[in-house]
Amino acid sequence: MKIKKKYCGHVIIVGKANVGKSTLLNNIIGKKISIVSRKKNTTQSNITGIKTEDNYQSIYIDTPGVVFDKNNNQMKHHKNNFYQTTQIATLIIFMIDRIDWTIHDEIILNEIKKTKIPILIIINKIDKISNKIILLPFINFLKKKIDFIEILPISAKKISNLILLKNIIKSYLPENCHIYPECYVTTNSDFFTVSEIIREQLILFLGDELPSIIKVEIESFKKKEKIALYIKAIIWVKNVRQKSIVIGHNGEKIKKISMISRNNIEKKFYIKTHLVLWVKDKN
């Protein structure tokens, strides 16, 4: 019996904040493993998604949106993580927002092309472009930048758009043993998953009021056989003013955040959950 060759590689998704990287990852994997919102810098750390189809395993890394210093247009915050992550890549997916090419896109491109790793560029959110004729001159503009392996105009929200993308990715995966079992869709720990579920509700409920430095820390995570899950989490903010914003009038906001977070945790883990949230300031 002939043994099938196996293929496996890392695919890094990069781009400015809020271009749709997390939406793309979730739709490729077929499950929500990365939180999505309109707020910039929703993704604060690398999210790994794994897609195994037959003898192909693609390991996707959704990186935090690249942030720039307003004064000098230099990359900041996640710069070191950006460089370290690209070192393991088989392929880089560079996402841009429609035909809005900026100096920041130019800087990101200049950095990733130094890696000599094949780059596929995605023009995302084309469903928001009413006059599709303007796409062609923009694609020609991109072709003059570097020799991209492909330039794909898509809407990351539409799964039907992703068939061609996944086929291109498969063609670039090297012959390798699979790193993860077929059932794996992410390397995220349960602690991380719970903290992200809570943080997603903070983003949705607080919107522009959300302190950018907010952090969710899982203090305890205990499972009583298969009966119930007991979680205590701390929401860290910078000062008393931010603390009052998160708690809300008479504690109404934090109650709603806690209730919906608990429901979403129960749906994720298929177990009754008891969730206690504390809001603390670092002063």
Curated annotation (Swiss-Prot):
Keyword Membrane appears in the UniProt entry: yes
Membrane topology, as annotated: Peripheral membrane protein
Keywords associated with the record: Cell membrane, Cytoplasm, GTP-binding, Membrane, Nucleotide-binding, Ribosome biogenesis, RNA-binding, rRNA-binding
Compartments, record wording: Cytoplasm; Cell membrane
Gene Ontology biological process terms, A to Z: ribosomal small subunit assembly
This protein's GO CC annotations: cytosol; plasma membrane
G3, as annotated region: 62-65
Region (G1) residue spans: 15-22
Region (G5): 154-156
Region described as G4: 124-127
InterPro entries assigned to the protein according to its UniProt record, in alphabetical order: G_ERA_dom, GTP-bd, GTPase_Era-like, KH_dom-like_a/b, KH_dom_type_2, KH_sf_prok-type, P-loop_NTPase, Small_GTP-bd
Domain KH type-2 as annotated: residue spans: 198-283
Region called G2, residue ranges: 41-45
Binding positions for GTP per the UniProt entry: 15-22, 62-66, 124-127
Domain Era-type G residues, every copy: 7-175
One Pfam family cited in the UniProt record for this chain: KH_2
CDD domains attached to this UniProt entry: Era (cd04163), KH-II_Era (cd22534)
UniProt-recorded Gene Ontology molecular function terms: GTP binding; GTPase activity; ribosomal small subunit binding; small ribosomal subunit rRNA binding
Similarity annotation: Belongs to the TRAFAC class TrmE-Era-EngA-EngB-Septin-like GTPase superfamily. Era GTPase family.
Function: An essential GTPase that binds both GDP and GTP, with rapid nucleotide exchange. Plays a role in 16S rRNA processing and 30S ribosomal subunit biogenesis and possibly also in cell cycle regulation and energy metabolism.
Quaternary structure and interacting proteins, as annotated: Monomer.
Full protein name: GTPase Era
Species this chain originates from: Buchnera aphidicola subsp. Acyrthosiphon pisum (strain 5A)
Gene coding for it: era
